[in-house]
Amino acid sequence: MIRIRLATSADEAQLLELVRAFPTPTPISADTYSRMFRSKRADPYACIAVAVRDESLVGYLSGHRHSAFYAAGDTAWVDEILVLDTERRSGVGRMLMAEFETWATEAGCTLTALATAGAADFYRALGYATKAGYFKKYLANGEPR
């Protein structure tokens, strides 16, 4: 059985392995991850939800909320979501998104948003609609190696 909950300090090491499985051009060091994990856990505007099966993490979602004039209130943004290949199509992603939406609703957010390259059908099935394109630019201290 899968349980979805907010991350605790006890999840730090196991979550690093999932974070490192996320497809990204910039690998994360253990020190950088640890600093970010602790900062996010202490930040009331950040959310890290984890999916647990038999005491093992099988997925996670990281997001945050911020105020946005266009939304006339707070917006919740999904930074990243990852589900292990062995758990795909089992509802884990849907459960993680539901947990994030609950967190956002309880925080008073007026909408939630995200960017995706390959999971558009998944988000449409959850009721999300395409609104805009996604652009990014690495800054001098964030260039991929």
Segments from the language model and where they lie:
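Glycine-rich phosphate/pyrophosphate-binding loop shared by adenosine-nucleotide-utilizing enzymes
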Residues: 2, 55-60, 76
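A short beta-loop-alpha structural element at the N-terminal edge
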Residues: 2-15
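Conserved acetyl-CoA-binding loop-helix of GNAT-fold acetyltransferases
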Residues: 83, 89-102
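Conserved active-site alpha-helix within GNAT-family acetyltransferase domains
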Residues: 94, 106, 110-112, 116-139
